[in-house]
């Protein structure tokens, strides 16, 4: 509001500020505002502040943007404080139910989301019907920019989290009398898999 935006907060802690443009088509600038212990002072919040500053500068210069700007501050991206994660993201996408207000709790205090926010209804900030795009400024959480001597870069790929599970079954036997060629120990096999994974990843440039 201090930046001249029409602001609101929903039941899931999502904060949105809107600056009308020449078109109802909306460009979203945002990030998450929660962080983790030792996450650094710029984790997430820098992207929200950058969006606010862009909108504020446009107002100060008397410029009406071509598109409506929505500055979005997303809650619980880290999934640390509460028992469920991505509350804001799920809320704006319409993928969370009202029962979450009582189901989701603070991991330390045990308070429900309803108690934490003091809200009675599960109102959520929705994505605009006409969305031009989503822009997020974020500090790099790796060494690449520093290594290459750059101060800024555009992200072309986002890492996807994929969990794989292997069950390696061995055969129990007497360790002092079973020759190595007759053993079926699972740990050496696991070691081979662990050793092969980095080489597999290195086949793809810039893989992490």
Task: Name what the model sees in each region.
Residues 36-44, 179-186:
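Alpha-helix N-cap/helix-initiation motif
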Residues 1-40, 58:
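Acidic/His- and Gly-rich active-site-bordering loop/insert found
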Residues 37-105:
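A generic, well-ordered mixed alpha/beta core segment in the N-terminal half of proteins
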Residues 76-77, 81-208:
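Midchain, well-structured core segments that form catalytic/ion-binding scaffolds
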Residues 27-32, 70-74, 167-169:
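Glycine- and acidic-rich phosphate- and metal-coordinating loops
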Residues 3-5, 22-27, 64-69, 129-133, ...:
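Short coil/turn connectors at secondary-structure junctions
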Residues 3, 61, 116-117:
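Residues at alpha-helix termini
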Residues 8, 72, 122:
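General small-molecule cofactor/ligand-binding pocket signal
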